[in-house]
């Protein structure tokens, strides 16, 4: 799975975190492992231009998704085909997202993770134009985001235990005599 991030926003954003959440969602949604995703972070003016050009709506927005192939929600796992080689592009506007994060009372990092999940789901064919679609998509979005956070906590716990074990074993000399 290849995920490329291009930060043209002028803001300091954790690209590895965006890649992590995108990779998690793509894997959890059973997208073929050869799939590729491109993410671009832009400033408000660029996002406003894209928003008018593609959605005919004024002003910037938080996230836009540009799928390469039309996919049906939930259609990927049962598909006999290996899946698209390129899922598409996600465009994020960190400055717009920062305002949303402030209003929601959480961090910009959390907002960008949420928007990344949202963008990937759009690439996979999910939408929220109708109330039932919105309920399904936002429920899945929140569930995936929470699963990703739990996965990060698990990884942190395992790393802390491994570090503790390394210190304990290193002090007793067990590690020094073991072939690696």
Swiss-Prot record:
Zn(2+) binds at residues 118, 122, 128. GO terms for cellular component: cytoplasm. Binds 1 zinc ion. The keyword Hydrolase applies. Its main location: cytoplasm. It is found in: Cytoplasm. SUPFAM superfamilies: Metalloproteases ('zincins'), catalytic domain. Keywords: Cytoplasm, Endonuclease, Hydrolase, Metal-binding, Nuclease, Ribosome biogenesis, rRNA processing, Zinc. It is an enzyme of class 3 (hydrolase). GO terms for biological process: rRNA processing. GO terms for molecular function: metalloendopeptidase activity; RNA endonuclease activity; zinc ion binding. Its EC number is 3.1.-.-. It comes from the Bacteria. Its cofactor is Zn(2+). Single strand-specific metallo-endoribonuclease involved in late-stage 70S ribosome quality control and in maturation of the 3' terminus of the 16S rRNA. This is Endoribonuclease YbeY.
